[in-house]
Amino acid sequence: YSWVAVRPKRGPLGESTRWPELSSEYTTKIFPHTPGPSGIMQDGTLQFSDSISWPITPFIGTLGTAPDREVRASIDGQGAWGGNLDMRDAAAGNRILMPVYHDGALFYLGDLHASQGDTEYTGTAAETCGTVRLYFELIKQKKLPFVRIEKPDALVAVQTARPLEVAVDTATQHLMAWLVDDYGFTPTDAY
């Protein structure tokens, strides 16, 4: 099973006068999962209703290392160390590179999702439970400015900032440096 909650006044439509029910009460919907061909949920489906379902695409919503400085909340917040990123790219088969600031990294994870659109508009995705198997490798003498994700077909430079334009600009600069420094691109080709 997974569940989604709609928090009052949350997201871009939370203050909507057209849909006042989005700002009135906290509501929760529970979705059954159907196992896939392998007999497990990882390749199964999420049943929204009798007529609507979609593939389960599990990923880790919150993962990070202990921050380099004292922060208000490293689990719910975000920063160069990771945190509550809620990115579908934090999934099986992808390599996640994270800065390490302390001996032992003090890695943490949680907030497993069965699926999610492009963000958590309502404050939640399809929240679920599961088992996560990880392999860690320490890359010495490597300083990362932020979390990076290597997918089989793409590189993802992660950045969180407000306003959005600052995050996009900083992620672009980090991706440029990554392509130039690690992959030998010229700045023009990387851009």
Q: Where are each of the predicted segments found?
A:
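Short, surface-exposed loop/turn segments at secondary-structure boundaries that line and modulate
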Residues: 1-19, 146-165, 171
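Hydrophobic/aromatic-lined pockets within catalytic cores
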Residues: 8, 101, 180
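Short C-terminal domain-edge/linker segments immediately following a structured domain
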Residues: 25-35, 127-133, 166-167
